Amino acid sequence: MSVLNGKKILLGVSGGIAAYKTASLVRLFIKAGAHVQVIMTPASKVFVTPLTLATLSKNPVYSTFYDTPEDVSAEESQLNGEGVWNNHVELALWADLMLIAPATANTLSKMASGTCDNLLLATYLSAKCPVYFAPAMDLDMYKHPSTLANFKALHEFGNTIIPAESGELASGLSGEGRMAEPENILAFIESDIANKLPLKGKKIIVTAGPTYEAIDPVRGITNKSSGKMGFVFP
């Protein structure tokens, strides 16, 4: 059984070509037994549709602070009390872990500096759960000093960076910067969580069967335990 079974995962999708991989990522999380909620930046919807991710996650996809009827402007909707407020604090508190994938250079920079101009950024600032980043950008952007400084800042905040992989990039160049494959992201997160489990690396002795405590040389106290409970443990 996956360590993600029953976990609530908040997936943040930013606007990069690697966003198309998030469909596979959502499917993998669902197969692992996780509950998935998706937040998309406005730019990410150019690369993958909210309908796709909503269908796969079986949950509505959030993108803006305020959902309004299609035929009404946001200003009119708010004045008339129509529409639905997407509470970023509730979304953040719901999650057991948060993953930003793909994490573009722009989104990384904003999160490292505390910028809060869309629903995903506001939710990140409200998150109390472990946060993972799967960067996706061109080689020179990935190696740029400002990007490296943002990685360092996010790491110091307690976040985890999933290293980008090498290969052909959208620019036609080849090198580091492409987002890790969905299977590798899943494996990375599962391994990271497993390594942080409270009993990881502990040596445990399991006893089974009845116990006997002497009262004196003649009498003693015992029980009729079968030991079955102890034998259940691997």
Write out the residue ranges for each language-model feature:
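A cross-family phosphate/adenosyl-ligand binding-site feature
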Residues: M1-V131, D138-G227, F231-P234
